[in-house]
């Protein structure tokens, strides 16, 4: 069924999923602009949203606040919609260093993009899908509000080929070069084409295995086939094919000429300005860099960092709203914001963060002032582009609640698990009380998480627990990537019984073995003790049937009161449902393998664990770095960007130690 979403799932909606789906769908059909789904941890929010997408049948953009979540959502949605276009759109900078300059140390950092090719393919696959069909879901990080080329230009430059069409072979080659394809008869890869007599083979920018073979008879296209690029095996005949540009910043020749004139004019004005300020080094640097870029644009129609000239290429006035992925969607599209209490503040902050970094580059002659217009949307611009939007969170923020006419709740877990019980206990004698509670959990082979407010308190507590003979680990921000994952794995395996940390809301801490969460200094109002943070922290004990939370505090703050009441309210709803349906809560069974995918490379080589980096010979270290780099590329190819980023960090650490 072309153009319609087909949801494939081994189970039907259950618990309070059916009512949540019905309410959200009804709201969308009535034209409600903002809706909020308040879904408790582990209630199957992704499945609910998938049902909503399938029923309203609109192109959908799902925004997540980091690549880990985006990757997980992408995998889940791909399973639910195997017959539809589920795409993935993240910025190269989600993993790699953007261009920057540090004046204090006179350090210029070029943009570093190692696993660019895979991400680039996925981005092209996403934008081309939007022009070819309506049954499209794009899972994106917040970088989807970042500047992109003009969608009109992108659409107009598509090369459309049909069997029987009259076109000279050389005219086709010229058109391919215009949309940034390179002729390469030897190294045939994405974004290239090759020619053999009357046969032109094109490798689309959005593919990595299949290419298009166009066979001519004179000046007529005789047949079009889809071919395996490696083996040459014919995969199918095509009547029609659309070749999308190999860059999102493509521009027609006449527009490019105009853009180059405008860039030259801006360059002259800026050079005069810098020289008048006595900034001769900056002026020389800017002239050299910009003239080189202009030369590349004249010769190749492209240059490295072309996005910095996007305002000129699109002939937009200074300060105007940039084009972004949102402009590639049709007008009636739907936006889903996952974990909205974190994602919306991120969307809000992107413009300022980017502006500060670019301003330094402009001030020191690395970029023209127009580069400031290659930027993310401001939050107000983002709001103007919303057609209909659903915010999804266990703890929606004030913005979502203010804008949504009613909140749709999803409280019941398919596993029957309840929100944990909560105790508030005085701080006097809290550590000895905590030790008693931990020992009870150890007896039952369960684990404990303890959250403190300061680094010193965490360190002192860890030492004290060790002296009391408890197997404890301290998880803090300075711990290296690989170690962090190993500590979590060791907690699950029982090497540790307790994990002490300051911020337990970072990803990777949904551990079914944890039945007790202890919150020290619960009555100190602040970021980590706000009602939202408390509810999220309490949720860390909601994956175990014996889940319990102890807050150590001498007074009950407003945040504590709200968090406790909300948890009680949810627990009562869940208990009532379980009683009615005869459900017995069972702890989630989760393979320990899940947690340790990222240590795969280190386990493969065994070197990293068997020998500390300092003890390795130069040759051993280089060998390990090579292995890890290969593993990193494999991970990115498999879309496991979390692992790719972790491996990148490990490589960085190894190089630093060398």
From Swiss-Prot:
Domain Helicase ATP-binding: 26-414
Highest rank taxon of the organism: Bacteria
Places the protein is found: Cytoplasm
Start and end residues of each Helicase C-terminal domain: 430-596
Keywords: ATP-binding, Cytoplasm, DNA damage, DNA excision, DNA repair, Excision nuclease, Nucleotide-binding, SOS response
Alphabetized CDD domains for the sequence: DEXHc_UvrB, SF2_C_UvrB
UniProt short sequence motif Beta-hairpin, positions renumbered to this chain: 92-115
Residues annotated for ATP binding in this entry: 39-46
Pfam families: Helicase_C, ResIII, UVR, UvrB, UvrB_inter
Residue span, UVR domain: 622-657
Intrachain disulfide bonds: none
Molecular functions (GO terms): ATP binding; ATP hydrolysis activity; DNA binding; excinuclease ABC activity
Swiss-Prot/TrEMBL GO biological process terms: nucleotide-excision repair; SOS response
One term under GO cellular component: excinuclease repair complex
Function of the protein: The UvrABC repair system catalyzes the recognition and processing of DNA lesions. A damage recognition complex composed of 2 UvrA and 2 UvrB subunits scans DNA for abnormalities. Upon binding of the UvrA(2)B(2) complex to a putative damaged site, the DNA wraps around one UvrB monomer. DNA wrap is dependent on ATP binding by UvrB and probably causes local melting of the DNA helix, facilitating insertion of UvrB beta-hairpin between the DNA strands. Then UvrB probes one DNA strand for the presence of a lesion.
Similarity annotation: Belongs to the UvrB family.
Quaternary structure note: Forms a heterotetramer with UvrA during the search for lesions. Interacts with UvrC in an incision complex.
Description of its domains: The beta-hairpin motif is involved in DNA binding.
Name the UniProt record assigns to this protein: UvrABC system protein B
């Amino acid at each position: 069924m072309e153009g319609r979403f087909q949801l494939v799932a081994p189970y039907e909606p259950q618990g309070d999923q059916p009512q949540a789906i019905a309410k959200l769908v009804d709201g969308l059909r009535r034209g409600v602009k903002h809706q909020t789904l308040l879904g408790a941890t582990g209630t199957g929010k992704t499945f609910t949203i998938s049902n909503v997408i399938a029923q309203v049948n609109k192109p959908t953009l799902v925004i997540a606040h980091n690549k880990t979540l985006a990757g997980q959502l992408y995998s889940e949605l791909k399973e639910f919609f195997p017959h539809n276009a589920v795409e993935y759109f993240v910025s190269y900078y989600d993993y790699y260093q953007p261009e920057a300059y540090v004046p204090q140390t006179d350090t210029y950092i070029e943009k570093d993009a190692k696993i660019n090719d895979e991400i680039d393919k996925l981005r092209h696959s996403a934008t081309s899908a939007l022009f070819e069909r309506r049954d499209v879901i794009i899972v994106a990080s917040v970088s989807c509000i970042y500047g992109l080329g003009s969608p009109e230009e992108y659409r107009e430059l598509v090369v459309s080929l049909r069997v029987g069409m009259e076109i000279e072979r050389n005219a086709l080659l010229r058109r391919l070069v215009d949309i940034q394809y390179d002729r390469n008869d030897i190294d045939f890869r994405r974004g290239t084409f090759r020619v053999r007599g009357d046969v032109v083979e094109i490798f689309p920018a959005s593919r990595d295995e299949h290419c298009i073979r166009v066979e001519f008879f004179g000046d007529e296209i005789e047949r079009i086939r889809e071919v395996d690029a490696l083996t040459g095996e014919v995969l199918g005949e095509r009547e029609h094919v659309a070749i999308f540009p190999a860059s999102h910043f493509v521009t027609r020749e006449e527009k490019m000429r105009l853009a180059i004139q405008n860039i030259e004019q801006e360059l002259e004005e800026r050079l005069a300005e810098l020289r008048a300020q006595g900034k001769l080094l900056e002026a020389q640097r800017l002239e050299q860099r910009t003239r080189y870029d202009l030369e590349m644009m004249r010769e190749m129609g492209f240059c490295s960092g072309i996005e910095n000239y996007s305002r000129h290429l699109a002939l937009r006035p200074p300060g105007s709203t940039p084009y972004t992925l949102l402009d590639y969607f049709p007008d009636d599209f739907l936006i889903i914001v996952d974990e909205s209490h974190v994602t919306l503040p991120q969307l809000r902050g992107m413009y300022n963060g980017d502006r500060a970094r670019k301003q330094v580059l402009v001030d020191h002659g690395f970029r023209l002032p127009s580069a400031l217009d290659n930027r993310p949307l401001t939050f107000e611009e983002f709001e103007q582009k919303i057609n209909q939007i659903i915010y999804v969170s266990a703890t929606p923020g004030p913005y979502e609640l203010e804008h949504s006419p009613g909140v749709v709740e999803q409280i019941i877990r398919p596993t029957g698990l309840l929100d944990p019980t909560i105790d508030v206990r005085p701080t006097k004698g809290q550590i000895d009380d905590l030790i008693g509670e931990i020992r009870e959990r150890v007896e039952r082979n369960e684990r404990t998480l303890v959250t403190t407010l300061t680094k010193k308190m965490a360190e002192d507590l860890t030492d004290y627990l060790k002296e009391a003979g408890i197997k404890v680990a301290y998880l803090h921000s300075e711990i290296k990537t690989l170690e962090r994952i190993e500590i979590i794995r060791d907690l699950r395996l029982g090497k540790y019984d307790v994990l002490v940390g300051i911020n337990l809301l970072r990803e990777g801490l949904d551990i079914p073995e944890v039945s007790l969460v202890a919150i020290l200094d619960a009555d100190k109002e602040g970021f980590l003790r706000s009602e939202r943070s408390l509810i999220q922290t309490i949720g860390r004990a909601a994956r175990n049937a014996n889940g319990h939370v102890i807050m150590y505090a001498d007074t009950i703050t407003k945040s504590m009161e709200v968090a406790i009441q909300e948890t009680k309210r949810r627990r009562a709803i869940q208990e009532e449902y379980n009683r009615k349906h005869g459900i017995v809560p069972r702890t989630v069974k989760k393979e320990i393998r899940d947690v340790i995918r990222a240590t795969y490379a280190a386990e493969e080589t065994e070197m990293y664990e068997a020998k500390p980096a300092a003890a390795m010979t130069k040759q051993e270290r280089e060998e390990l770095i090579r292995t890890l780099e290969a593993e990193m590329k494999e991970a990115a190819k498999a879309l496991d960007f979390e692992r790719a980023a972790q491996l990148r960090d490990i490589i960085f650490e190894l190089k630093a130690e060398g």
